[in-house]
């Protein structure tokens, strides 16, 4: 039989255990709140991005067409520019064959490290001879070097010079690897680009073809879903799945009443996420 003192001790111990448990719960909760707050503040203050984060089209700033671009769309109706990055490659000739078959001119943004491969240079010359535009896509395609180490203009100059040496043309249009945002957000580097007479082109539709190996149908669907305006610039790459998808992409735009256009330096269309009308 428990005495009153025993009852008191039991109640005291129970209250003590509850009090300790409550303090423990409060301590853990406070720690978790502080941890979550710290992680949030760090994530909000981050100023660098990985290429994987940068290339997501959902995070893109909508392109604000220049008045010249609006006039072109009004004068010509629906216009689409097919663009191909990362060449020249072993697929360049096949892309040119397919484009020739459909009587379509395209815009290529070629990489310096590939342009230096002499066995691919005939395809670069052929592209220009057949009426396509060849612009620059940097020498290295390295985000850190181009944007953080401020080598964008020197690399583009070197790549444009290579194109001139191979083709005799003097292009001024470049496509920033991973797009112009956020790498070219600094006005200082944009001033350098403008002073160098370089023009930038981003895109209105990212096909995401580079990540869709063996999925040409998904590439086509991405482009269909992204097509919303009378003036579209489609980002693609020299990939096997892109080559396979291209006939369906061409047929889609023909059915939708689009005309295929190639970049013309005398009629520059502003097409950069930065909305910088100098570029």
Identify the role of each PLM range.
Residues 1-22:
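N-terminal Lys/Arg-rich, disordered targeting/topogenic segments
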Residues 22-24, 176:
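Hydrophobic alpha-helical segments, especially transmembrane helices
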Residues 25-41:
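Hydrophobic membrane-insertion alpha-helices, especially the h-region
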Residues 52-147, 151-165:
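Active-site beta->alpha N-cap acidic-glycine motif
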Residues 99, 117-119, 211-213, 270-273:
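Short, charged, surface-exposed secondary-structure boundary motifs
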Residues 141-265, 273-278:
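Catalytic domains of cell-wall/extracellular-matrix polysaccharide-remodeling enzymes
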């Amino acid at each position: 039989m428990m005495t009153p003192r025993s009852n008191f001790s039991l109640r005291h111990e129970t209250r003590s255990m509850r009090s300790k448990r409550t303090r423990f719960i409060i301590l853990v909760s406070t720690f978790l709140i502080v941890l979550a707050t710290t992680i949030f503040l760090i994530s909000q203050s981050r100023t660098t991005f990985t290429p994987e984060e940068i290339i997501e089209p959902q995070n893109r700033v909508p392109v604000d067409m220049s008045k010249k671009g609006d006039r072109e769309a009004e004068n010509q109706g629906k216009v689409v520019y097919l663009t191909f990055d990362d060449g020249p490659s072993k697929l360049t000739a096949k892309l040119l064959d397919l484009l020739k078959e459909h009587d379509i001119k395209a815009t290529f943004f070629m990489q310096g490290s590939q342009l230096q491969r002499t066995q691919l240079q005939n395809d670069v010359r052929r592209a220009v001879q057949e009426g396509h535009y060849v612009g620059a896509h940097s020498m290295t395609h390295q985000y850190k070097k181009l944007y953080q180490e401020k080598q964008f203009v020197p690399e583009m100059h070197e790549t444009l010079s290579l194109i001139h040496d191979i083709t005799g043309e003097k292009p001024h249009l470049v496509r920033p690897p991973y797009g112009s945002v956020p790498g070219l957000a600094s006005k200082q580097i944009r001033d350098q680009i403008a002073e160098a007479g370089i023009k930038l082109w981003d895109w209105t539709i990212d096909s995401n073809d580079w990540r869709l190996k063996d999925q040409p149908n998904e590439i086509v669907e991405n482009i269909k879903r992204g097509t919303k305006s009378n003036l579209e610039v489609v980002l693609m790459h020299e990939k096997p799945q892109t080559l396979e998808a291209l006939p369906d992409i061409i047929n889609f735009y023909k059915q939708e009443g689009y005309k295929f256009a190639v970049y013309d330096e005398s009629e520059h269309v502003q097409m950069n996420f930065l909305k910088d009308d100098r570029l």
